[in-house]
Amino acid sequence: MSDQPETPSNSRNSHENVGAKKADANVASKFRSLHISETTKPLTSTRALYKTTRNNSRGATEFHKHVCKLAWKYLACIDKSSISHIEIEMKFGVITDKRTHRRMTPHNKPFIVQNRNGRLVSNVPEQMFSSFQELLRSKSENPSKCAPRVVKQVQKYTKDSIYNCNNASKVGKLTSWRCSEDLRNKELKLTYIKKVRVKDFLIRYPQSSLDAKISISLEVPEYETSAAFRNGFILQRTKSRSTYTFNDKMPLHLDLTKVTTTRRNSHQYTSHEVEVEMDPIFKETISANDREKFNEYMCSFLNASDLIRKAAERDNMLTT
């Protein structure tokens, strides 16, 4: 497999383009059907959710269960007073070896890469990014007349300034500070956040042009007077983000973001990011120590990841 993500070819004939549109519609349909319940309340049993993945391989289902177990292990250790600040998100891109900077060699099934060995380059090819935009925009702007609106889109333009603390401790290295500014509404106040990484899971997927990173973090509101914001920022990220939600039927939302990053005393570069974030309702399961219901939300989250990666594999979809 190539060390770089595969970008769909521009030399498609008209017949293939028709097939691609049908394949995209199929994925959109699966996104509509991927939900826990009509009210976002958890199922009474994880068994029903696992049945929805019966078309997946047994190995994929077992891997999802394994990820659920690992995630719960770290979430269960978070202090109750911090549960309201938990964020779980998944970014897509390519996992590269920290030593060689080449894409990690795949196994014959999904596996978790140790953080000390790899890192996720959270940038997808621009053409793939545009395909995602087109797919989701069509569902947002042209909902079915016979069905309720399935996808809702919100567009935001922001600038994040990222700060670092002069703290060499382990906790200090896992912490960053962010000041966010709304570029379209100057009347809104700046927001200040301290972000503490709890755990990252780097997932290398075989036979896929996209890998993923699941991040569990704490995002804690801060004040402008916090010591970290007295230093100069280490980088700025100007973002044009489209956020898609799914009628409260899926306990997650999808972000497509074009990012221009400027590092201090360095050059600018542009990236295209695709990420999924769990909606806050999952925090209720942690407060209640309800592992079974959390697994339902987490499996829905992982199933969405599978659909996103499938949508990226246009060549594979055209043959099905």
From Swiss-Prot:
Primary localization: cytoplasm
Cross-referenced Gene3D superfamilies = mRNA triphosphatase Cet1-like (3.20.100.10)
Regions of biased composition (Basic and acidic residues) lie at 13-23
- Which residues fall in a compositionally biased region of kind Polar residues? 1-12
- MF-aspect GO terms: mRNA 5'-triphosphate monophosphatase activity; polynucleotide 5'-phosphatase activity
Q: Where is this region: Disordered?
A: 1-23
SUPFAM superfamilies according to UniProt: CYTH-like phosphatases
How is the cofactor bound here? Magnesium and/or manganese. Specific for polynucleotide RNA in the presence of magnesium, but becomes specific for nucleotide triphosphates in the presence of manganese.
What does the record give as cofactor? Mg(2+); Mn(2+)
One GO term of the biological process aspect: 7-methylguanosine mRNA capping
- Subcellular location(s) per record: Cytoplasm; Nucleus
UniProt EC number: 3.6.1.74
The protein's name is Polynucleotide 5'-triphosphatase CTL1
